[in-house]
């Protein structure tokens, strides 16, 4: 009985963290290496709708390790990703100001230590949203990254927290 509260708090913390990030939707995948046992190695393309900016979707391609380790979630995926964000509808901000820089999405790409991250930055001078993807580890990250920008129409001002 004494373990219920810590478990409940951990579950609540996980749900709060999960709800803050964008959700991915797999658009497609291509196999790159055939694996006799387990899924093949592949490149996947996922779509992420920006949770705080309606009308912007980011597409991220990345390698996904197959085989038995990949199927069990024990494999470490490569730290290489590419990103392209586009205006997919009318851009709006829901009346809430954005942080100058904010993590939009993160996903575990190894059992414990490595994450793929997508960060949104605001270039207020050029009225543009800049999106960066990179991976990091507990000890050191990878310098490999990819960046894209979405210009916001001139009549729409990006609200930024001061």
Where are these regions (language model features)?
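Cleavable N-terminal signal peptides
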Residues: 10-11, 22
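C-terminal partner/receptor-binding element of secreted or periplasmic proteins
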Residues: 125-162
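Bacterial N-terminal signal peptides that target proteins for export
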Residues: 1-9
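N-terminal export/targeting and maturation segments
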Residues: 22-66
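C-terminal motif of bacterial Sec signal peptides marking the signal peptidase cleavage site
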Residues: 17-18
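Mature extracytoplasmic domains of secretory-pathway proteins
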Residues: 57-122
């Amino acid at each position: 009985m004494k373990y219920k509260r810590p478990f409940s708090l951990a579950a609540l913390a996980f749900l709060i963290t999960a709800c803050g990030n964008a959700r991915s939707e797999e658009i497609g995948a291509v196999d790159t290496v055939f694996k006799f046992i387990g899924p093949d190695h592949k490149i996947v393309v996922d779509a992420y709708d920006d949770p705080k900016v309606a009308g912007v979707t980011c597409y991220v391609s990345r390698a996904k390790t197959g085989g038995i380790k990949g199927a069990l979630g024990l494999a470490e995926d490569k730290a290489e990703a590419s990103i392209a964000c586009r205006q997919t509808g009318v851009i709006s901000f829901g009346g809430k100001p954005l942080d100058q820089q904010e993590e939009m999405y993160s996903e575990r790409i190894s059992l414990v230590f490595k994450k793929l991250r997508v960060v949104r930055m605001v270039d207020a001078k050029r009225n543009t949203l800049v999106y960066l993807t990179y991976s990091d580890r507990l000890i050191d990250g990878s310098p490999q990254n990819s960046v894209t920008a979405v210009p916001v129409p001139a009549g729409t001002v990006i609200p930024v927290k001061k």
